[in-house]
Amino acid sequence: VGVSVAILVGNLVNRAEIYGSHKTGYFLVRAGMPTDSSGKETANTIEVISISGAGASNVGVAGAAAINIFNTAYTANVNGNLTAQSSQESSVTAKVNQKITTKAGASADLEGAESGNSSSTGNSGSTGNSSNSGSSSGGSDKSVGVGASFGLTIADTTADAKVAGGNIKTAGNFAVKSVINSEMETYVEAGNDAYEDADGKSTSDKADRKYDSLDAAVSVSLVSSNANAEISSGTTVDTGGNL
């Protein structure tokens, strides 16, 4: 028996808020991503990997399960009286950049182990899109081993930029912006290494096999992305530029 299980359950919260009365040159209320040394925005990386032995004749049961449940909430909120005297743009911004990866698979091919794989990928702006595909196969002869891999990704991402009330007066432009850039991958492989070689080829020699193996690969992805930019009713906005 060779079984591997990896589970991540996480919550990431980022809040930037201003309350009360303030007078300044310009204001930037931002719940967003830090920058690297070159000034480029970074991204959150959330990764779960589970690797087990292959399901083959000399392994009775081999399985890998990777479960990735992650919630991200970025909020930029203004509620008060703000006056910006500079012509430079003032803004309220919530922005999320993230890459979510879930992988489950066997550590190596064993003689006679057929393979199956299942993967789902998605990219989202304010909403998420995903696609799923899967296959499994087995051989036939003397002994039988069972190998299975399962990958589950549940990702809920929100970015809220909001002016909840008060009076906003700016000499320049005023913007309320919400952005989500989300890349998601759920990759599952049974019987073969979850990491292929540089050419994406398997090195398993399946000719003249003497054993049988039953492999299954299942991937499930549930992704929700919601980006909201709002100026609440009752809020007064007086801008010298564009809104």
Language-model segment annotations:
Residues 1-243:
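Low-complexity, glycine- and small/polar-enriched segments
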